[in-house]
């Protein structure tokens, strides 16, 4: 007997509701033209890595808990004397989410993490890059439920980039609004 395959809630919502809403609004000639989420890239830069080389490893462990996937340690491409950074020195961590993990992270981000951000007034609707990708920053990684507040010795910021197959910012903005992204008015 075949077991039912797990499908994330937001992916199911995209297939059943969001695709139809996008088709009605933009009237695409082909259903393959309807924009969809491509990937989510989470980057955590660790500026204190110059003083303590263990910091990027700690940040990577927190990022792994948040994303549910092992991150890659990013290294400096060239030396910068002013920042005391040497070439190939670990300076952060990043992870690329696709598929089910991407939809699960998006669900937690929109419904749990963003409402917990202090003084949150909504996402900047101008943070699109002109090609349908949205970038945002979070100053404290403790807004995610996977991070235990009592065990955190230092708070890290992170960049979150949501890449879509949309060709214009308007299409991407509509897609993310359908995924209930809280944009500022």
Curated annotation (Swiss-Prot):
Superkingdom classification of source: Bacteria
GO biological process: translation
GO CC annotation: ribonucleoprotein complex; ribosome
Pfam families attached to this UniProt entry: Ribosomal_L5, Ribosomal_L5_C
Subunit record text: Part of the 50S ribosomal subunit; part of the 5S rRNA/L5/L18/L25 subcomplex. Contacts the 5S rRNA and the P site tRNA. Forms a bridge to the 30S subunit in the 70S ribosome.
Protein family membership: Belongs to the universal ribosomal protein uL5 family.
Protein role: This is one of the proteins that bind and probably mediate the attachment of the 5S RNA into the large ribosomal subunit, where it forms part of the central protuberance. In the 70S ribosome it contacts protein S13 of the 30S subunit (bridge B1b), connecting the 2 subunits; this bridge is implicated in subunit movement. Contacts the P site tRNA; the 5S rRNA and some of its associated proteins might help stabilize positioning of ribosome-bound tRNAs.
Matches recorded under PANTHER family: 60S RIBOSOMAL PROTEIN L11-RELATED
Entry protein name: Large ribosomal subunit protein uL5
Species this chain originates from: Rhizobium etli (strain ATCC 51251 / DSM 11541 / JCM 21823 / NBRC 15573 / CFN 42)
Gene that encodes the chain: rplE
